[in-house]
Amino acid sequence: MAAVVEVILAVMVVFLWPLTSVASSNVSSTLQCDKTNKRLATETISTPQATLKLACPSSTTFLPTYTGDAGTQTVYLTQDGSSTEKLQTALPGATAKQEDSQTNEMTLTFPQLPDTSQTVYFHCLGTENIAGQGSRKEVCGFAVTLTAPPPQGPQACVVPGTTIRLGIANEGDTTRFTCGGDLKLSPTAADKVFKEDCSTEESLKDLKRSEDKNSYFVLTATKTPSKTTHCYLCEPDPTKKGHNDKNCAVLIAVGAGSRPTARSVFGVAAPCILALLHFT
């Protein structure tokens, strides 16, 4: 019943928000809902392993409701809240956490960027009393956009069963990625790589693999590489209790004219397009 009420409230509040935009790379801050001006506070995240805290005013209700389980937590796919999706379906690997049930704050983590840019929305819903006019619904909210990584990265391979795609075209080009969580890179030898089938090991040619100070693996083209696709696997540690048997795959298209093919492993529901009415 609570879920039905939530949907009804979200659909009732249909509006055009002015925007308060903030562009970030690896966020670790709090985004405040602008209740006074009823603005949509926005954040753009362009690097993996980012953290963002969303704070609704104390007099409002955070929507979608916090479930306490990242697997069931939902988000809005449209600004008006008419379309919803599970958080981890829209943004693989993302988590949501509420430190205190008495606060209207939610902390989001985004370990891995999506294959295609994705925006999710949250609302802060309350009631405003107007002298002589009764009350009306008031709302502010958040729009959080995760951008798809460019061919050169950086990107993180974190979610078992998914694939990230990067690219190197010419001499001197680089691409950066890391294995997140407890996942370990395979092949381990710096001069080895898998073919596109992700199972046949071969020597790494025309490319050099190194590691930067942030524990990202860096592939650099020492000369213009032949056109092909390389694969690395981020594998779970079999000694870890309860480990996932699935790998996260890193496909790297190399050679002049190569472009990584964007393909989402998880289906993302397409937002329905509805007419937006002014909120008054």
From Swiss-Prot:
Localisation per UniProt entry: Cell membrane
Glycosylation-annotated residues: 26
KW Chaperone (keyword) present: no
Cellular component terms (Gene Ontology): plasma membrane; side of membrane
Signal peptide segment: 1-23
Membrane topology: Lipid-anchor; GPI-anchor
Keywords linked to the UniProt accession: Cell membrane, Glycoprotein, GPI-anchor, Lipoprotein, Membrane, Signal
Prosegment residue ranges: 257-280
Protein name: Merozoite 31 kDa surface antigen
Organism: Sarcocystis muris
Native organism taxonomy: Eukaryota, Sar, Alveolata, Apicomplexa, Conoidasida
